[in-house]
């Protein structure tokens, strides 16, 4: 029986150094391997010219350099009119994840939205991924491979490379903290080809308090986005079940500490859902919650998901909500929904490609406007 090969990028530098020592090689070989992968983008041990042929062979017998591949049985990237691109990747265990490339209309900024888990344990009611349940965490290598693969594609197809990374794909990144942190450290390492500053990395969380505290403790000054979606406790509990464990008051307290540690605004993501969270009273509650927090509001046009009984807010409701927020001193941006037509926008990561799971129509409550 052939030995199952593992992705060498799943190892931290320290773990790889220990492994290299166990092979009777000097520990600095680990740094050479990392340099080949992350500075030069090689995908084969045979390309690592300063390693002996025998050592290259030994590594190739036990490890691979790349752990993801685009799906062969589906369109791995589909071009929309705005040139948003969805990538569907197959992992070594036949699970699937998605990444979304979002170019800027007016600048050279190239943003990649990446996944951190297969599925998600937090079961947000408006999100297709939440109905998958949690399958597993992504490894360090699987997280980084999304950036490596799209960088190669981008260089071949359009020129340039990824400049911004947002952990807003499948999964809760702060529930896969160690692997996401290790990936961020590599993405921001000036010795490697990514050369992405921490200010251009955004970690989005549903409000997982232990993870936010760990993020504060690390000193990693990346941007923080909170999937808030309501400042009404009962409504937020309906939308985001973890809110039953971590209340809005608890969330506000930890975000105040985050503001004290990092002098940059927190982004509150707010999907406007008709008759759920889009009334003027909802806007007033949002402004009260935000008082005392250095923050901005990113309003999102809700993208309808098959079999989930939520609807996007009508334009009139949206504009009234925005006006009320501005009246109360909030900084508001509206995220252009780019990629909904290819099931790539928030909440649209294609559940059917992950493990063929279907879910029945979800009934949701309605709140008066």
From Swiss-Prot:
Its EC number is 2.1.1.192. It comes from the Bacteria. Its main location: cytoplasm. This is Probable dual-specificity RNA methyltransferase RlmN. It holds the Pfam family Radical_SAM. Binds 1 [4Fe-4S] cluster. The cluster is coordinated with 3 cysteines and an exchangeable S-adenosyl-L-methionine. Specifically methylates position 2 of adenine 2503 in 23S rRNA and position 2 of adenine 37 in tRNAs. The lineage of its organism: Bacteria, Pseudomonadati, Chlorobiota, Chlorobiia, Chlorobiales. Belongs to the radical SAM superfamily. RlmN family. [4Fe-4S] cluster binds at residues 120, 124, 127.
């Amino acid at each position: 029986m052939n030995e199952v090969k593992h992705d060498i990028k799943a190892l931290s530098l320290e773990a790889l150094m220990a492994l290299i020592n166990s092979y009777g090689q000097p520990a600095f070989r680990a740094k050479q391997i990392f340099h080949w992968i992350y500075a030069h983008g090689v995908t084969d041990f045979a390309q690592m010219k300063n390693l002996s042929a025998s050592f290259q062979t030994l590594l190739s017998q036990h490890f691979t350099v790349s752990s993801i591949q685009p799906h062969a049985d589906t369109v791995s990237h589909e071009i929309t009119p705005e040139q948003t691109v969805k990538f569907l990747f197959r992992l070594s265990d036949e699970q699937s994840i998605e990444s979304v490339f979002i170019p800027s209309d007016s600048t050279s900024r190239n943003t990649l939205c990446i996944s951190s888990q297969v599925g998600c344990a937090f079961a947000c009611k408006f999100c297709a991924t939440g109905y998958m349940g949690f399958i597993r965490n992504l490894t360090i290598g699987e997280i980084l491979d999304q950036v490596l693969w799209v960088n190669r594609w981008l260089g071949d197809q359009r020129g340039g490379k990824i400049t911004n990374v947002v952990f807003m794909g499948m999964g809760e990144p702060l529930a896969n903290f160690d692997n996401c942190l290790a990936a961020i450290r590599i993405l921001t390492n000036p010795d490697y080809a990514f050369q992405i500053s921490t200010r251009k990395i955004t970690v989005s969380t549903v409000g997982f308090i232990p993870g936010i505290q760990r993020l504060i403790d690390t000193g990693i000054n990346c941007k923080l986005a909170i999937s808030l979606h309501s400042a009404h406790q009962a409504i937020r509990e309906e939308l985001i079940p973890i809110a039953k464990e971590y209340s809005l008051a608890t969330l506000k307290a930890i975000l105040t500490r985050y503001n004290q540690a990092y002098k940059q605004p927190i982004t509150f993501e707010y999907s406007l859902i008709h008759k759920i969270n889009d009334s003027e009273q909802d806007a007033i509650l949002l402004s009260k919650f935000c008082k005392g927090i250095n923050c901005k509001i990113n309003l999102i046009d809700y993208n309808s998901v098959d079999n989930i009984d939520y609807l996007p807010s009508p334009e009139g409701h949206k504009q009234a909500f925005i006006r009320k927020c501005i009246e109360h001193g909030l900084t508001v941006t509206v995220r252009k929904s780019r990629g909904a037509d290819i099931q790539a926008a928030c909440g649209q990561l294609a559940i059917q490609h992950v493990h063929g799971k279907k879910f029945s129509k979800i009934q949701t409550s309605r709140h008066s406007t």
